[in-house]
Amino acid sequence: MYIGRIVAFGMTKDGRPCAMYRVSSRSFPNRRAVENQGKIAIVPREGAEGDLAKNPYISYNCLRIAGEWAIATNGSQTDPITEKIAMGMPVRDAITLSLLALDYEKDSLDTPRVVAVVGRESKKGFLGIVRKDAVLVREFDLVPGQARYISTYECNSPADEYVDNDFDAACENCAVQYVVNGGVFANIENPVTSAAAIATDDGFALGTLIC
């Protein structure tokens, strides 16, 4: 099954919140997640820089931290959402305003923008999407051993059924692996790269994986 880019949040079985992002792509598979100065960006792999001329949407910050919140998205919405949350705006409003302002991507597929935000202290998670036909944002309570997700295609609403009830990750490297081939994600096709932030005692630890 191919469902495009995936954002997810969850809580490990020992109670640590986690945000995850996975690039699944048919058209532009030559990408990688790179950590730099406390954030993670999606960039072309060496030798594939020319892909940016074909599609400007394929490179962006995909994961950032704002205080107690970890923000994962599939596009340039990462930055305004993070900045609004850092300025004190409620998470729901920061997601909604940023998605409305940027709208869906104006590529050949009208690709939706998706967002997952998780709180280290609040024990809350949010999923959001802007599609050509809708803007949807929803808040969830975190549950140990559970991850929720939304994707650009197919699983493209913050619905109860898009859930993994056996989620666990011992560390950030385990989280990036899980969103590629763990639980419900194992049967999703065309993994390219992934990123994750998992809560620690004093913040979040970041991890990346190239498939």
Regions found by a protein language model. Name each.
Residues 1-211:
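Conserved short alpha-helical segments that host acidic/polar catalytic motifs at enzyme active sites
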